[in-house]
């Protein structure tokens, strides 16, 4: 070809979705380079693979590139985008590049407001356990592989489908899961919930006539759209009319036990499932993977092994173990990406079920002023269900501040509600010290948020273990 694409440059390479696509393309034989504003473990890992990376954005970084891929966060006035436009180098949105990848395989796309990353990981793990060696691109690090993505030799590619900017409408899967639909990223849809639901219908209709929609009927909004979906549907959930249904749920520490009943056309034997994840919300995520397995005729034994041995996803109820408390005891630390009230409520319930009787301490960094404004009362209600709360300022994610939708306003409203007395920590950099001062023996600390709070558990661990080491040195004879 006259304009063959050999060198692809990624602007915003450190993002979870971007890094995954870049890694798969690199393994397909393309030359990959990329830039990001800040250094990260993701960038360093890609460097180790042989991918060229740059810190900061400059027009010179795209030298030699045949195409430039951008994330949603990259603006039109980015110097690398401007340089590409000036040189007539194609500028490709991330979702379009993901769609190109999906053309090489049979695509299974996981959509929904919550649970996409965990569900994508579970589906990937089930296919891998069955020997299907899928390609995958996930928004989190799959712990069993240690990466966000992998190029497999099999026929399937499993991807997250992002509704936040409506970019999932670029994808052409042969099977699609919708985990739930809630009001989030409403600015994309003109603050019209009907438009959001309509976008999910349009997404499902991107499948070919032989495609299958795997839909969670426990979500009222998903149930609402079902009459308008013209492709074949397999429903799942805890509801009595679900075709793939879980009953007899039981928590066992950070694991869930349940029985699956399957009656999609043909009634299959019940499955006694052990899931290596906590919470009823993760039972729903596992049910979607089981429904996919039914469609692909994956043996039950492979499904059961995959779910029982699932090693989790980075920042999804991720345990950091026990850390020393100021009073001489120990407290447990769990890190979670959840940042919407629905996600937070599910994770808090999972924590209560997995660790009954423990004092639950929530450390939360709100994500985006617009979400804080739109979900303000729900945030106050959910945070009030914890036993203690440490709250930081909002992680802006590029947004301008919104009056009365900041961290201090949330803390004030939480205090007025009277359920809990919050500790407000303006700078997230001071959060590890604030946690150390407030944690007690036996506490369960849950760090939640999609912003820079993700670095807090690691910094807390380093700080407390260094303090412990120093104390031991002082008391040594």
Curated annotation (Swiss-Prot):
Pfam families (UniProt xref): Mur_ligase, Mur_ligase_C, Mur_ligase_M
Location, primary (coarse class): cytoplasm
Top-level taxon: Bacteria
Compartment(s) where it occurs, according to its Swiss-Prot or TrEMBL record: Cytoplasm
E.C. number: 6.3.2.8
Coiled-coil stretches: none
Reaction(s) this enzyme catalyzes, per UniProt: UDP-N-acetyl-alpha-D-muramate + L-alanine + ATP = UDP-N-acetyl-alpha-D-muramoyl-L-alanine + ADP + phosphate + H(+)
Signal peptide span: none
Keyword Ligase applies: yes
Enzyme class: ligase
Chain positions recorded as ATP binding sites: 112-118
Protein name: UDP-N-acetylmuramate--L-alanine ligase
Organism encoding this protein: Verminephrobacter eiseniae (strain EF01-2)
């Amino acid at each position: 070809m006259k304009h063959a694409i050999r060198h692809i440059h990624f602007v915003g390479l450190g993002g979870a979705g971007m890094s995954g696509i870049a890694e798969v393309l690199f393994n397909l034989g393309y030359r990959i380079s990329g830039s990001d504003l800040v250094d990260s473990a993701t960038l360093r890992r890609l460097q180790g693979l042989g991918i060229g990376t740059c810190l900061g954005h400059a027009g010179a970084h795209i030298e030699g590139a045949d195409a430039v891929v951008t994330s949603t966060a990259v603006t039109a006035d980015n110097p690398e985008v401007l340089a590409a436009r000036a040189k007539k180098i194609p500028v490709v949105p991330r979702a379009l590049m993901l769609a190109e990848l999906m053309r090489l395989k049979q695509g299974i796309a996981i959509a929904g407001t919550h649970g996409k990353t965990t569900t994508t990981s579970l589906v990937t793990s089930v296919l891998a356990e069955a020997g299907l060696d899928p390609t995958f691109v996930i928004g989190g690090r799959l712990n069993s592989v240690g990466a966000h993505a992998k190029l497999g030799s099999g026929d399937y590619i499993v991807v997250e489908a992002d509704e936040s900017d409506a970019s999932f409408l670029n994808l052409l899967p042969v099977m699609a899961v919708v985990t739930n639909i809630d009001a989030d990223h409403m600015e994309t849809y003109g603050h019209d919930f009907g438009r959001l639901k309509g976008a999910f219908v349009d997404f499902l209709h991107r499948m070919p006539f032989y495609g299958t929609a795997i839909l969670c009927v426990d979500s009222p909004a998903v149930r609402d759209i079902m009459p308008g979906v013209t492709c074949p549907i397999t429903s799942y959930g805890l509801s009595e009319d679900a075709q793939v249904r879980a009953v007899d749920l039981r928590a066992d520490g950070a694991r869930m036990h349940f029985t699956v009943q399957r009656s999609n056309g043909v009634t299959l034997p019940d499955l006694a499932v052990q899931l290596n994840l906590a919470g009823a919300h993760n039972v729903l995520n596992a049910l979607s993977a089981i429904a996919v397995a039914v469609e692909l005729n994956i043996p039950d034994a492979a499904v059961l092994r995959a779910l029982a041995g699932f090693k989790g996803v980075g920042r999804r109820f991720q345990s950091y173990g026990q850390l020393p408390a100021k009073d001489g005891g120990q407290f447990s630390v769990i890190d979670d990406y959840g940042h919407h009230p629905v996600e937070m409520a599910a994770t808090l319930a999972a924590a209560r079920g997995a660790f009954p009787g423990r004092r639950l301490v929530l450390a939360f960094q709100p994500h985006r002023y617009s979400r804080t404004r739109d979900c303000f009362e729900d945030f106050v209600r959910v945070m009030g269900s914890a036993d203690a709360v440490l709250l930081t300022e909002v992680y802006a994610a590029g947004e301008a501040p919104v009056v009365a939708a900041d961290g201090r306003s949330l803390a004030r409203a939480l205090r007025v509600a009277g359920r809990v007395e919050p500790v407000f920590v303006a700078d997230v950099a001071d959060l590890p010290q604030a946690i150390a001062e407030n944690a007690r023996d036996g506490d369960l600390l849950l760090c939640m948020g999609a912003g820079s709070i993700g670095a807090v558990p690691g910094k807390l661990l380093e700080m407390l273990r260094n303090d412990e080491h120093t104390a031991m040195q002082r008391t040594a004879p």
